[in-house]
Design a protein with these regions (language model features):
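Membrane-interface helix-loop junctions and terminal tails of multi-pass membrane proteins
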Residues: 1-243
Length: 243
């Protein structure tokens, strides 16, 4: 059996997502006011490239969702990924919170209508579009069977570019694990948890959108995804009660 073990998947995603949390939110918080949007985006992109290319993780729940929808990973693998990513996001945020002191910027949470961020409509649009773009890059790189280092480089570059775009809009989201971890430890930001839904739901929708766009430009078809006729038949059986 060549499938990675559940423990290995969880451990890899935990480590990879922790690296992303340190390279992104960690740099933003511990660097204080000296870290600009470009430096933060570079940190996010490099950390993602390291997580994919060296650790063997994808370090983002919407990446795992897209790979599952494209039949690149199994349901078991996707669930293992999500567990590891959530734990890594929380642990990474806890590390940053523990290292931080009162002289530094206290929060790297996402949001809107505060701290100089854009309004909700702009945030939702940006999160959706950038999620589609980054997922498209990942699926295109994987479907072309590029070397892992190339997948890591292209995906990391796309992720960093997206974060540079998003930094002034909402603090850089498109990664539910990153957003959840940061929100839990954003003790000085009362909006963080209440606004968290946008940074979980919208990127997930963007992952589906990225998959659909990928199907339009790739040689793959809908039958190569979980949305093939088998899914329709299974759903029909559930509704009608047929075995």
């Amino acid at each position: 059996m060549n499938d990675p073990s559940t423990v290995r998947l969880i451990a890899a995603e935990f480590a990879g997502t922790t690296i992303v949390m340190l390279g992104g939110p960690g740099l933003m918080v511990l660097g204080g006011g000296s870290i600009g949007a470009l430096e933060a985006a570079l940190g996010f992109g490099l950390a993602m490239a390291i997580a994919i290319g060296v650790i063997g993780a994808v370090a983002n729940p919407i990446f795992s969702l897209a790979l599952f929808l494209a039949r690149q990973i199994s349901p078991r693998e996707s669930v293992s990924d999500w567990i590891g990513q959530l734990l890594g996001g929380i642990f990474g945020a806890a590390l940053v919170f523990g290292i931080n002191d009162t002289d530094r910027v206290p929060s790297a949470a996402n949001g809107w209508d505060h701290s100089g961020f854009a309004e909700l409509g702009s945030v939702l649009a940006a999160e959706l579009v950038l999620s589609v773009v980054v997922v498209l890059v990942l699926l295109s790189a994987v479907s072309q069977r590029l070397a892992t280092t190339s997948v890591a480089a292209f995906t990391g570059a796309a992720y960093g570019m997206a974060m540079l775009f998003l930094m002034r809009i909402d603090g850089g989201g498109i990664n539910p694990a990153r957003s959840i971890g940061s929100a839990l430890f954003a003790d000085t930001d009362p909006n963080a948890l209440g606004q968290l839904w946008a940074f979980v739901v919208v990127p997930a929708v963007g992952a589906v959108g990225g998959l659909m766009l990928w199907l339009l430009i790739d040689e793959a078809t809908i039958d190569d995804t979980v949305f093939d006729e088998t899914l329709v038949e299974t759903a029909s059986d559930v509704v009608t009660g047929d075995d």
